[in-house]
Every structure is written in structure tokens, then in C-alpha cells.
Amino acid sequence: MGSQEVLGHAARLASSGLLLQVLFRLITFVLNAFILRFLSKEIVGVVNVRLTLLYSTTLFLAREAFRRACLSGGTQRDWSQTLNLLWLTVPLGVFWSLFLGWIWLQLLEVPDPNVVPHYATGVVLFGLSAVVELLGEPFWVLAQAHMFVKLKVIAESLSVILKSVLTAFLVLWLPHWGLYIFSLAQLFYTTVLVLCYVIYFTKLLGSPESTKLQTLPVSRITDLLPNITRNGAFINWKEAKLTWSFFKQSFLKQILTEGERYVMTFLNVLNFGDQGVYDIVNNLGSLVARLIFQPIEESFYIFFAKVLERGKDATLQKQEDVAVAAAVLESLLKLALLAGLTITVFGFAYSQLALDIYGGTMLSSGSGPVLLRSYCLYVLLLAINGVTECFTFAAMSKEEVDRYNFVMLALSSSFLVLSYLLTRWCGSVGFILANCFNMGIRITQSLCFIHRYYRRSPHRPLAGLHLSPVLLGTFALSGGVTAVSEVFLCCEQGWPARLAHIAVGAFCLGATLGTAFLTETKLIHFLRTQLGVPRRTDKMT
């Protein structure tokens, strides 16, 4: 497969399923906005930070390493032993949920029962929901290994929507239930998620005419249950040792992913109300990153990994592939920079309005607007880092990856310390500032690698980080106009003034996008020829 074909495949992969995800996200966005108007920020903080951290930590400790080990090395293996190994996640999950549940109940600060009722029940049910989700782990890994991509999207999206609907119903009709509401909804979510996989494989394996059965290593649903293999070995010990190696390495990822919640939970730098507001703003701010930047990053990592030879100098590779990779990297950097700048510039003037529409005065009257404005800057760094790291990780040699992991280890430690110090100094904004510092270091590392990689070639993909002076001036003018508009029109003067503020923003956004269309012709050509390629209708795979 040539580099242009790989590029076309990566572009289609980046857009496949995106519409479905946007639809599901939009539904849950509306439901969550409705739910927030009936809750206190203390309950939101306990659920979204404290209890969700218990759930995610249990799942991480019980399954993360198993997933990475069992998805390594392709599909050619003794799947009976692999499935047996995956079933060990269930007793591990029981152990970790009991151990962590004891810590959550006995060692951490317990919320005021008058403000957040039924905390102990919430801890028990969130731990139980993690164990229930682990019951579907063998099905999930089998689906991932055989590229049943849309099954994952539909199962997770359906589960989230039904969870949000149940939560909204209980909050509206039984608000006095407190944490019972979210605990039951979480348990319902994991049950539906597991049932989606079980029902799908039951129907698939019960249909002999299905073409997918030819690629699956099992023929009956009972083959997915634990059993002794033909050679008498219950598990593959090589996979088991690999699992242990991944378990040790995965702590770095967990610290970077959930570091803020660990600092909040164990160091008590914020009260439960501030934790709730921070988590809502964090989820709202990261929505664009999850919907747009993450699919692009994942898909074009595959492109770079297939086109370039890992650890080999650019001058020693096929020059056509190197040129295509450089052109794509330049366009992706430009796209990330433009998207990030747009969010940053317009986010400053519309953060308070967005939070007021989404969650009412609970979000828009306190620290929420400052948090979201700060997060808009962080989104710009997230966008650039996603592109630079997807190239860097695809082109680095194993030794370079090991050195990079060492830097990441130092960054994770500094992030925790910096988060603690900055939150003591400036409150919850300190978490975002610490993330910006962390992301800035990672971007610098990746940019240095890209510069060295193309140093002896005629290609300069980092030119994608340069914008025309006219476009930069348009961004600056738009930022100034919308800032003035916010002062005079938002957000205490009623909906006519708000609509006028929105109209000003729409005009400025149109002018900015029009200027970008006229000045960034190379990027427009890339978007038209690659991301705009017509696609066949995909079947569920």
C-alpha cells in the first residue's frame, strides 16, 4: 500500500464514526445540562471526582495492563489462554474495589451527610459497578482485536445516553435520594455496556452464515468462558509476564490522566463544591479535544507509523514517503493551530455565557468563567501536542521512546508537585496552569525531535506553526471586539443583549474563517483532497 493510499485510509478513519459520536455527545450534553440545574455543586464534586476516581482506579489497576498485553502481537495466538488470562481481571477487580473502598470510607474525608447523603452506599455501588464492567472484559478485548470498531462506539454511546436518561428521571422525581441516584445510574451504565457486548457476540456466534465467524477464534459463546486448554496450561505465561511489565509502566499514564483528581482527593486542596465546578468545566472544555483532536491524532498516528520507518533517519528512507509525511504534518500543525487559536480567542469572551446556558448561575457566577477561559488556552496546547506527539511516537526508535518515557516520568512527578503548589496559590485554576506547563514541555520535546528528524532534508513541516500576519491581525481584532461586546452585552442584561453578543461573535468568527480560507490555501487544499474524500458506507466492524 502506497503512502497516498495510507493517507486516504487515515483520513477516512479520522472521520468515520465522528458524526455518530457527535450525535450521542449532543444528546448527553443536553441531558447533563438539564441534570445540573437540580444539583448542588457539592454532590457534583463527590460524584464526578471522588466516586468516579474510585471507579476508574479500580478498573485501571484490574484491567489496563491485561488489555495492553492481550492486544499486543496480533490475533494469531491461543485465544483460550488469552481469554483465561482476561477473566483474572474479575477477582482482581473484587480485591481492588474492596481495598480502595475501605480507603475511601475510612481514610478520606467523608462529606457532610446533610449536604451529600448516602456516601457509603455510593462507594459500595461504584466499586460494584467496576466489577460488573470487568465481566465484559474478554468480550471487549476480542472485539478490539478483531476491529469491531462501531460495536465499541455504539455500546458505549448507548450506555451513556441511557445512564443520563435514568439520572435525569431520578433527579427530577426523587431528588432526595442523593448519591443513590448516581450510584444506581452508574451500575445501570456498566450493566448495559456489558450486555451490549454479550448480546452482540451471542447473536453473532448464533448466525453460522456470518462472514465474521471466519476470522473469530471462537465458535460458541461458551468458548469465551474460562476453561482448561488442550495442552493443559490455563494461561500463557509469556502474556502473563508481559502483563506485569505493562502494569508497572501504566502507572505513569494513570498519574498523568487522573493526577488532578488524586491531588484533590488525597490532599484536600479544594472543597467538594470547587471540585464539582472544576470537573464540569474540565469536561466541557475537553469536549472539543475528545471529539475532534483525538480522532485525528489516533488516525494519523497510524498513517505516520505505516509510511515512516521507525528510528531511521529521514535521508535514508523513501523520499516520496518522507515528503508526503512532511506535507501532512505541516497541514495538521496548521489545522491544530487554527482550531486551537479559534477556541482560545473566542472562548475568552463567551465562557461566561456558555456556562450560564449550560449550568445556570452555579457555574457562571463563581470561579467557572475564569476556569473555562484558562482551559481555552490549554485546548490550544492540547491541539498542537496531539499532532506533534502522534508524529514523534510513530518515528522514534525504541531507545528514543525509552528516553522520552523517562522525561514523562519526571513530568508526572513535577505535575503533581506543581498542581499542589499552584492550587494553594490561586485555587482550581492552578490545575490548568500546571497542565499548561506540562503540555508546554511535551510540545517542546516533540518540536525538537521533529526539527532534528528533518534537519538534513529539504522539508520544513514546522512551517505549519506560522500564520500569515493578516490572519493573526484578524484573530487579534476579533478577540478585542468580542471582549468589548462581552463587557456591554453580557450577561446580566437579558436575552436580547445576549443574542446581540452572540451575533457579534458570529460575525467575527465568519470574518476570521474567511480570512483563513483566503490566506491558508495549502491547508484548504489538504482538507479538500484528504478529509473531504467521499467514503463508502461502512458496515459495523
Swiss-Prot record:
Keyword Transmembrane helix: yes
Keyword entries, A-Z: Congenital disorder of glycosylation, Disease variant, Endoplasmic reticulum, Membrane, Sugar transport, Transmembrane, Transmembrane helix, Transport
One Gene Ontology term, aspect cellular component: endoplasmic reticulum membrane
The protein's role, per its UniProt record: Intramembrane glycolipid transporter that operates in the biosynthetic pathway of dolichol-linked oligosaccharides, the glycan precursors employed in protein asparagine (N)-glycosylation. The sequential addition of sugars to dolichol pyrophosphate produces dolichol-linked oligosaccharides containing fourteen sugars, including two GlcNAcs, nine mannoses and three glucoses. Once assembled, the oligosaccharide is transferred from the lipid to nascent proteins by oligosaccharyltransferases.
InterPro entries: RFT1 (IPR007594)
Localization per record: Endoplasmic reticulum membrane
UniProt pathway annotation: Protein modification; protein glycosylation
Source species: Homo sapiens
Official protein name in the record: Man(5)GlcNAc(2)-PP-dolichol translocation protein RFT1
Bilayer topology term: Multi-pass membrane protein
Any Pfam family matching the protein: Rft-1
Involvement in disease: Congenital disorder of glycosylation 1N: A form of congenital disorder of glycosylation, a multisystem disorder caused by a defect in glycoprotein biosynthesis and characterized by under-glycosylated serum glycoproteins. Congenital disorders of glycosylation result in a wide variety of clinical features, such as defects in the nervous system development, psychomotor retardation, dysmorphic features, hypotonia, coagulation disorders, and immunodeficiency.
Family of this protein: Belongs to the RFT1 family.
BP GO annotations: dolichol-linked oligosaccharide biosynthetic process; glycolipid translocation; protein N-linked glycosylation
GN (gene name): RFT1
